[in-house]
């Protein structure tokens, strides 16, 4: 068994106690799936779902003109191929986008003026170009104007209905006022709210409030219908003086008896007077058949009639609906002989009179009046007509064009109110509004619950696809207006669809979204982890979201529903804390935009293998066990009572009541947090810093994967897309630093493919953060790779695992005060070995433009410069690759024509003699800015189409063409070899039916002779189809088919090659006015130095304070010096003990490595090495793997482990203290992991033993080189004439008011005068100073500071006549 990389992952000693149930979903699927659903690019037009782009087109089209005689209908859309590929877009500063065409149909109608019947006159169909739409790259990013960007998903409030109360803060009485709000996806908001008098009001779009019954009446309800909808009625019967009410079990439960209730047959008293109607009492009544309950007259007085009470004889209305029944009215009812009537059941305890009170306040009686009242509120000042009022009201909530609840909104509305409206009804219905009010009244009456806005069932994620869909809709609506206007202005029958459609507004909106939206962000490309995290980020900010200032504490806080969905740890420190979050490791987003997390299904106390995803609403009410709950071999819970979560609480639940179980302990944290070993032993604040700082780790020159990891490193490296992953299974044909060629196994490739995979690696490219992206092969020729194997490492990856820092030997002890306040003392060995050296790449651009005075020119012929300055430029004026540059050096020579100046007679003479070229240009070359020192690693030249190419451009083109040609030849060679192999297997050994001659007429294969390999080799491949075989069924056909396929594949390869070469030689699209553009790339090597920021993974950060010679570092008894000394005081108060456990486990890992190294040095027998390794790993699969290796392979494995045995301690189920002790023991160390150290300077042992171990330490992107800055002379501000500030402007240090006081306190008068005048804003003094320095005098003549003039001018601008009187002192 060849030792391949695939085995590398087995070599991590994993301490996980829980078996992996499901794989972590691809980490960037959230981006890719969303955009896929939006574009539906691989789905044929007729099969596309009504979602994404398709839904936008369908919702805006058809567009009709104002007179309804023509309509423009949408048929389908199609996407072309992008003009440039990803790499070219990067280089040329282009957008990676595909052209879009939309097929539309223009239908023109004829309308018969007499009958009004419409008939089709004309139908025209046409494909119209619809601008470009950016495409997503393989890695879930977009390339916009040459830079890689990420669209961050937005977490916003879900559409639907929300109930809330003011917690008693609105009114002084402290009364709790309830409110309801219907939020659509787009359209008007609808708010219902109670005031302190219990009257229900409504607001439309947050306008002035009006009684809610106005809205309900506008829906077509009368006051009587409303009362009977919201209130139950009681039937009252009259017979002479006797009065009774019908027994209604539901209403009786809240009432008392007024007199004894007697069974009329037996005379038995069933319920005594003044007793409550209990359930038992009501049951007893029913058994005795009692349906009427006697009541007294005073019980009816004060009730309200639920319908008009009418005299049957005369038709006169005695009591109107909603009118209070008084004793007089009751007497009249009796007198008129009315035997029964209905009253509303309102007891003001369980049923309040708020809706009835609202009807009394509301002075509007009819639907028409209600509509006009609403119109007046929304459009004050407009004279209302019934028609316009009705149209306005219908458009508000019932018109799909103006109002859209979306499927999610409808789902939430149905869920909350228990409705059964179909999901495709996405406007409000009459029933919706009535039910919203009913639920609100119930809330007031003490039934139902208010909503928690921070619950993840009420917040949903808008990913890329949906955000872009909304932008597209905005663009199309703008376009729709223009189309309607064009239709009405011109004769439609003479137009084609393309005359009507102008796609500019749509393109503009999309461009603006990608270029400047708050959610379209410059990708954080510092290292692979920062890329993955950026794509998995959720932001509550952005258009339609919250703002930093308005977001309160609740929104930012961790919520129980975040468990397994949103990480409680990873969020920025500062004003955005809690508003920007990260998806948890296993979380995904469902079709409605809710975040889901997987759980194992538990049935009858047994955990099944089934895994299902649940959203926050779906998991509500389920009892969920934790992933580490103890189970036996059958998957049954060991303990009777298990710790579980239910409705946001942690409870002890009986095992039979459990329904779900977490899939993994790391389910609740994000990717970055899951990379921190022993996270469970860290304080949350420090873990937050740790997960954030890992994203700032700079990729180092020598990547080194962590000895103590968590097992997530491989997943992150693979999903981030920085390493190269094999597309098919096959054998490595050739490998060099910049490409890998893999011949695909025959059973893998399809007929359309070529059978060859060529992987061109990225070499020393620049990332968005100027770090270096470089890929290195990890396979050898002849290796067999499987689909999905890592074949080349990218930045910060080591053998396919994420490697952000270095494993270093640390000691926790003070050392001469150099680790005061978190400072870090490091050994010079780390800088010598380039352990923390990183490469940074800067890009510089020089543009030659066509100016008013003439064309700028890129050339090496620059006036007034010596040979020495120009020695590294080639004849085109561009610096050669490999040149070492320092600040001020010229990278690209450029001259610009000067304006015409008055020439002196001498200059005129010189011009006459030497021609005009001498003095009319100035040097505007591109120079290296201050603080940059490095090596030129590349230059690219872009010139306008039709311009002559210079020699440098031609050379670059030649090199590129060579590369392409090499790829083409390799592909052809491999597929030809593969075809020849197939043909030989078919033909060799068969009998020839005809003789075959070579081109000289010599017989190579005789008739009836056996065909041999040598004979075949002598015939050119294209003549093999002449060979005929006797008795071989279908062999000739197979040969012909293989040769035809081969030719076809070769043609495809050649076509692709020619196309690429043609693209290469074509001129470039440059911005207007630009003739030529040159980009120069400089690689800067940054060694670790004093002032650089470093950090561990546990939020333990510090700044390098001193680099100590190796011999001065504290050393162990065997003479090994430590590499870093940290302050032990940094641990206890910060409570990030995880770093100590990591140090101990790392020490054990390192010690085991040293033991293996010792064995190898002593040439111990392989059996001894194997036995030791099996003792270290102690797992069955590892032992079996080690047994399967031969001696050479075992030695190779051992050599790999010399630097230390990698361990994985997954979060929340990591190594226990016993396991760490056992590992230390196997490494031959003391259990305390403390060592006697000796002072490197004196050789004396330190007084106490010191904790020593191996920690994984990162170098962060805050490098001192980028921050340190000094200025002697530089630019000044235009108005104040003071030096600018900041490194970017090459500014000075600010000397403020307090610094002036300090100078005054020391009495440093002359120094202070200098600071405030010539070094700041004294223009005349500066000039005199310059003269004095040139003449060698060292005197100071300060003048008047410019700020004084500014002050005078400001006072004059206030119309104060201020002037400075200058004169002699007397």
Swiss-Prot record:
Enzyme class, broadest EC rank: transferase
Enzyme Commission (EC) number: 2.7.7.6
Keyword Mitochondrion included in the entry's annotation: no
Keyword Transferase: yes
Catalysed transformations (reactions): RNA(n) + a ribonucleoside 5'-triphosphate = RNA(n+1) + diphosphate
PROSITE patterns given in the database record: RNA_POL_BETA
One Pfam assignment: RNA_pol_Rpb2_45
Gene Ontology MF terms: DNA binding; DNA-directed RNA polymerase activity; ribonucleoside binding
Membrane-traversing stretches: none
SUPFAM superfamilies: beta and beta-prime subunits of DNA dependent RNA-polymerase
InterPro entries with a match to the protein in the record: DNA-dir_RNA_pol_bsu_ext_1_sf (IPR042107), DNA-dir_RNA_pol_bsu_external_1 (IPR019462), DNA-dir_RNA_pol_su2 (IPR015712), DNA-dir_RNAP_su2_dom (IPR007120), DNA-dir_RNAP_su2_hyb_sf (IPR037033), RNA_pol_bsu_bac (IPR010243), RNA_pol_bsu_CS (IPR007121), RNA_pol_bsu_protrusion (IPR007644)
S-S pairs: none
GO BP: DNA-templated transcription
Record function comment: DNA-dependent RNA polymerase catalyzes the transcription of DNA into RNA using the four ribonucleoside triphosphates as substrates.
Subunit description: The RNAP catalytic core consists of 2 alpha, 1 beta, 1 beta' and 1 omega subunit. When a sigma factor is associated with the core the holoenzyme is formed, which can initiate transcription.
Protein name: DNA-directed RNA polymerase subunit beta
Species of origin: Geobacter metallireducens (strain ATCC 53774 / DSM 7210 / GS-15)
Biological classification of the source: Bacteria, Pseudomonadati, Thermodesulfobacteriota, Desulfuromonadia, Geobacterales
Gene: rpoB
